[in-house]
Amino acid sequence: GFSGEVLYAPYGQRWAVGADLNQVWKRDFNQRLGFQDYEVLTGHLSINYEFPSPRVLATARAGRYLARDVGATFELTRIFESGVRLGGFFTLTDVSSAEFGEGSFDKGISLSLPLDLLLTNSSRRVSAMTLRPLFRDGGQMVNVSSGLYSAIGKYSRGSLDLGWNRFLD
């Protein structure tokens, strides 16, 4: 599929707003170049705010998901000085509890570990995982490897404040 994203993140501010749009097709079961008869246009508006102490990133997204359901996702992520990120999220959409099945809505926790912590040499790579109690169609987003906010996160107000404080120590 195709994906695009825009982000407005004023320098020195703790907030950012963005939008993404994705046109995707479902691949054939044999994983070759064919597609199934399913395509969807998804998109979300997002707002991010980074609280200063302790460093917590709050994100809210609203839009259309892969199952053509409409709703919102809310995330809170604690960012530790080591670069470790631990977060939780939940998604509420127009899919009824009866349609969604057990669990009623999508939810889970995420963990991101910088490989720098585990290796003897410097690395910018990160190992990330998301744990969900159940996988259902409702509330699922396109999995984009790296969004714009995460790409500029090291230049956020919280990161700059932390770096400056370390420089002065």
Positions of PLM-derived features:
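Transmembrane beta-strand segments that form the barrel wall of outer-membrane beta-barrel proteins
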Residues: 1, 17-25, 29, 55-65, ...
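Solvent-exposed loop/turn segments connecting transmembrane beta-strands
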Residues: 1-3, 11, 28, 37, ...
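Feature captures outer-membrane beta-barrel proteins of Gram-negative bacteria and organelles
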Residues: 2-21, 41-51, 70-90, 106-115
